[in-house]
Amino acid sequence: MSATRSRLVTRIAALALSLAAAGSALSATASPAEAASGPARSSRHDAGPTCRGQGVDPDALVRYRSEVLVDAPLSAVFRTQTDVEQWPSWQAGVLTSERLDSGPLRAGSSFRWTTPVPATPSTPATTLEITSTVHQLQRNHCVRWTGPADGDGIHIDEGTHVWTFTEVRGGVLVRTEETWTGEQAEADVPTSTEALGAGLEIWLKDLKAAAESRATC
């Protein structure tokens, strides 16, 4: 393994371990909806969430899908998730988030956000910067965005992220799926998938807590 690839794997492993540790309590408290998660099957016929007919990258090797039931009004859940500039106020894994345009979030909107990557014995701590562009959005129903991520020693060519929101008995079922592509992300698919999955589980947990808290205010 080259030195560059070794450093990358170390970086991704550190991110995976950090996120997994932060979300370790999830499995003990997961509802049936929350339990339906894991690396998504690569089959084109295994239908995941879509927004206006578009889903994640069907050819991506790194992918993860999950869902959570949120006991809050649909509008509150959708608003919490799509008010991207407020992410740092309720997402433990988001340091900063800024819109690169103005007005309501819509197809064509872009935003830049950052998440920490912890230090390892061989690499210093860094910050992963993600620039996302919304391609599809349907109010109170779904949103899909894509974009690259860059940090010291780590790069994801493109992440594709889809969210759907459906009213069901007991609240709103939030489903999400994300894929990563690029040589670096694919250098160690299991570890990259672990990092992606741990991050999405924490995101869902934080979204549930934030939306339910705001609904009771």
Language model region names:
Residues 1-35:
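Secretory targeting and sorting signals
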Residues 2-5, 30-101:
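Hydrophobic ligand-binding cavity/cleft-lining segments
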Residues 61, 108, 140-142, 169-173:
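A generic structural signal for beta-strand entry/edge sites
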Residues 63-65, 125-132, 156-162:
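Short, surface-exposed coil-to-beta transition loops
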Residues 70, 74, 80, 127-128, ...:
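Solvent-exposed, acidic/flexible segments
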Residues 76-81, 87, 111, 134, ...:
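Hydrophobic pocket/interface hotspot
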Residues 99-153, 205, 210-217:
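Glycine-rich portal/gate segments that line the openings of hydrophobic small-molecule binding cavities
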Residues 146-198, 202, 207:
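Beta-strand/loop substructures that line and gate deep hydrophobic ligand-binding cavities in soluble
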